[in-house]
């Protein structure tokens, strides 16, 4: 795995040696608006509270802000609750992520439909089972780069990476859905800390330690909400399952410090500090990074 990590960091470093991504404001097409309307008005097992519909309805009433931007690798149709929230999105970083997944031979640009709902990922009260509304925040249609839907602001950068893998046909369909999701999430979180490190080994190792500790402490709590902590019941695929894979890869840092920094959070990545937020040009209130 060390060879793969070295390769990943080298790839990320080369990405940040390239010029910044140039975004331009555009008007969303009728096709894109119809897709967004259809998705927001369709029930989904991942969004049982239908946060998508609530936000779309508020958008139509004129109470929310829509921004559509395009670069050479894709476009983002973003719906924000406030104008100030626009400064929470790391535009250059998202563009670089799209560029790293983009395949020239395919020539299909990514389309990301981002509904920046501010609701946070939190554990349910007591020891109630964890449901999709506690933890999920996006989906896509497999092998379709034009259908990435993210409907929660918190941890949206990690969700973008997760869904890009599905959209690029990287799923091992020989595996069960739970295992595919666990593998995808394991890779998403590894890629996330790699790109935040900008390919710097020292920063990467520090983030790897923080992410490992966050994962382990969070999953100790997750198991208490499961009927059988050794099973693959929900949300094993996003939590215990991905930790198992990191452990198998030999990258899980098991050095745990005292204290509970997770508290009630079900955000899957360790929250970035203000230094990282400044580096990626987002305001300190940003949960999107």
Provide a role label for each language-model segment.
Residues 2-59, 64:
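Short Lys/Arg-enriched alpha/beta "domain-start" segment
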Residues 41-146, 150-154, 198-199:
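Auxiliary, metal-adjacent structural segments of Zn-dependent hydrolase domains
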Residues 93-100, 187-194, 248-251:
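Amphipathic alpha-helical segments that form well-ordered structural scaffolds
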Residues 19-29, 89, 128, 229-235:
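Short, polar loop/linker segments at the starts of domains and inter-domain junctions
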Residues 158-171, 188:
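Active-site recognition of the HExxH zinc-binding catalytic motif
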Residues 172-222:
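Post-HExxH zinc-binding segment in Zn-dependent metallohydrolases
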Residues 88, 155, 178-182:
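Intrinsic disorder
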Residues 213-289:
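Pan-zinc metallopeptidase signature
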């Amino acid at each position: 795995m060390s060879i793969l990590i070295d390769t990943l960091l080298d790839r990320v470093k080369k990405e940040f040696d390239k010029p910044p991504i140039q975004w331009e404001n555009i008007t969303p097409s009728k096709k894109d608006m119809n897709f967004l309307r259809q998705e927001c008005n369709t029930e989904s097992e991942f969004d049982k509270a239908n946060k998508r519909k609530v936000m779309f309805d508020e958008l139509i009433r004129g109470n929310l802000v829509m921004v559509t931007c395009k670069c050479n690798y894709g476009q983002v149709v973003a719906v924000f609750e406030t104008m100030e929230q626009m400064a929470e999105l790391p535009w250059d970083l998202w563009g670089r992520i799209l560029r790293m997944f983009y395949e020239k031979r395919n020539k299909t640009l990514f389309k990301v439909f981002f509904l920046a709902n501010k609701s946070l990922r939190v554990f349910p009260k007591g020891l109630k089972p964890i449901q999709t509304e506690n933890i999920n925040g996006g989906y896509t249609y497999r092998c379709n780069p034009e259908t990435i839907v993210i409907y929660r602001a918190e941890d949206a950068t990690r969700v973008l990476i997760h869904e890009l893998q599905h959209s690029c046909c990287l799923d091992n369909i020989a595996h069960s859905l739970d295992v595919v999701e666990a593998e995808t999430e394991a890779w998403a979180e590894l890629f996330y800390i790699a790109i935040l490190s900008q390919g710097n080994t020292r920063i990467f190792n520090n983030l790897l330690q923080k992410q490992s500790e966050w994962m382990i402490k969070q999953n100790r709590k997750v198991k208490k909400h499961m009927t059988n902590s050794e099973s693959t019941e929900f949300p094993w695929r996003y939590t215990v399952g991905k930790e198992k894979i990191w452990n198998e890869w030999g990258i899980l840092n098991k050095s745990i410090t005292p204290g509970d920094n997770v508290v009630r959070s079900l955000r899957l990545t360790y929250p970035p500090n203000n230094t990282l937020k400044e580096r990626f040009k987002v305001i300190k209130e940003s949960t999107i990074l």
